[in-house]
Amino acid sequence: MADQLSEEQISEFKEAFSLFDKDGDGTITTKELGTVMRSLGQNPSQAELEDMINEVDADGNGTIDFPEFLTMMARKMRDTDSEEEIKEAFKVFDKDGNGYISAAELRHVMTNLGEKLTDSEVDEMIREADVDGDGQINYEEFVKMMLSK
C-alpha cells in the first residue's frame, strides 16, 4: 500500500511523523498521539487513542512505527477526506469562526503542532492556497488545497 506514494509524499509524511514522535525514538505512543490531537483541539479518551494505534499497529507492539504510519496515511488518502473531515479540519484552523483562515491562525495551529514557521513560510502557505488573492484562505480554497494533496 505504501509503495503507491510518491517520494514527495513520503518525505511530507516523514515530517508529520516526526511531529507526532516527540521523543524522536522512531515510534508514536498513545501519549504522543494524544498530545498532538489535543494541540489540534481534539480531546480523545485513552481508549480512543488505543483504538487508533491498534488500527494500524501491524506488529502489535502498542506503538506506530514509520512503515505503519505510511500504511495508515496511504489508506487515509485512498479513502479521500470526507466532506465532514475537511469541515472539521477547517474549524481547527479558523479559530475565530469567521469563515477565513488568516496567517495568524495558521501560524497559531502550526506552532501548537510544534512547527516553528517563519513569517515568510506562513505567507508562502497562504499564497499557495489563496486562489482569490485576499490574503486569507476561505473554505472553498481550503477544500481545493486538501483535495489536491
UniProtKB/Swiss-Prot annotation:
User: Site positions for Not N6-methylated, renumbered to this chain?
Assistant: 116
Name assigned to this protein:
Calmodulin
Q: Where does the chain bind Ca(2+) 3?
A: 94, 96, 98, 100, 105
Q: Which GO terms of the molecular function aspect are on file? A: calcium ion binding
Origin species, per record, is Agaricus bisporus (White button mushroom)
Q: Which terms are listed as keywords in the entry?
A: Acetylation, Calcium, Isopeptide bond, Metal-binding, Repeat, Ubl conjugation
Please tell me where Ca(2+) 2 binds in this chain. 57, 59, 61, 63, 68
Q: What is the annotated role of this protein in its UniProt record? A: Calmodulin mediates the control of a large number of enzymes, ion channels and other proteins by Ca(2+). Among the enzymes to be stimulated by the calmodulin-Ca(2+) complex are a number of protein kinases and phosphatases.
Q: Spell out the note in the miscellaneous section.
A: This protein has four functional calcium-binding sites.
Give the EF-hand domain ranges. 8-43, 44-79, 81-116, 117-149
The UniProt record gives the binding positions of Ca(2+) 4 as 130, 132, 134, 136, 141
Where does the source fall among the domains of life? Eukaryota
